[in-house]
């Protein structure tokens, strides 16, 4: 991992915030990076920033340019590199929940940073036709860290495989002092898929007993209801 220290060895403040030593527990911030046309409606695309005492982590990277392969989805882009409040250089670690185009299209912005992805997902993205935009997967300088199964990336931040949306999908489980918070990518695209889980990945997310679950294509997090049963 590329530590974020200044020349004195002290952690650098981020965007007017205090130093990392002042952050008692990880916090999660959703960032809107695009809208896509899906089934006649505009669908948001979010990435998520984890501010951890040891590193700033970005979960998924959105997309930064148009491509003929997805022109029918009429992308409206708000790339991270053009957002005034977002410090591209301040990201230490990248995690891809999976490698569909709207989750890896900004990976090139973080060349040289460790980018964690399940090995199965990376293999599929590189070998299967019509899976993703391969030029975006292997953009110059992207440094993947292939993962096999569960992995603790930082204390209290771990990766959990959740096959379903793709065989190599994973979620990020963040311990915040109570029940965990999950950043789930497209393991569930809509709330209803967690209300009534059908895929192995969706059932695994519910089994984590999360306080809330951030999804890539919903404006608000999903929260379990007391009368729901897996």
List where the protein language model places each region:
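Metal-dependent catalytic neighborhoods of phosphoester/phosphodiester hydrolases
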Residues: 105-111, 224-228
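Zn-dependent metallo-beta-lactamase
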Residues: 1-58, 63-67, 201-212, 221-230
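Short, structured coil segments at secondary-structure junctions
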Residues: 24, 110-111, 140, 209
């Amino acid at each position: 991992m590329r530590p974020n220290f200044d020349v004195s060895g002290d952690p650098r403040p981020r965007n007017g915030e205090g130093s990392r030593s002042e952050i008692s527990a990880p916090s999660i911030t959703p960032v809107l990076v695009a809208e896509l046309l899906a089934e006649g409606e505009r669908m948001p695309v979010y990435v998520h920033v984890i501010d951890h005492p040891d590193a700033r982590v970005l979960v998924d990277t959105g997309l930064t340019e148009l491509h003929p392969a997805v022109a029918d989805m009429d992308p409206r882009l708000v790339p991270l590199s053009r957002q005034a409040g977002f410090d591209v250089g301040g990201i230490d670690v990248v995690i891809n929940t999976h490698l569909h185009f709207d989750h890896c299209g900004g990976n090139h912005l973080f060349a040289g940073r460790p980018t964690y992805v399940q090995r199965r997902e990376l293999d599929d993205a590189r070998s299967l036709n019509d899976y993703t935009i391969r030029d975006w997967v292997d953009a110059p300088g992207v440094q993947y860290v292939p993962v096999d199964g569960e992995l603790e990336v930082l204390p209290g931040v771990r990766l959990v495989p959740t096959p379903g949306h793709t065989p190599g999908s994973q979620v990020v489980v963040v311990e915040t002092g109570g029940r965990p918070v999950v950043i789930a990518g497209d393991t569930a695209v809509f709330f209803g898929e967690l209300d009534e889980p059908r895929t192995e990945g969706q059932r695994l997310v519910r089994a984590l007993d999360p306080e809330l679950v951030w999804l890539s294509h919903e404006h608000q997090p999903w929260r379990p209801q007391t009368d729901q049963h897996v």
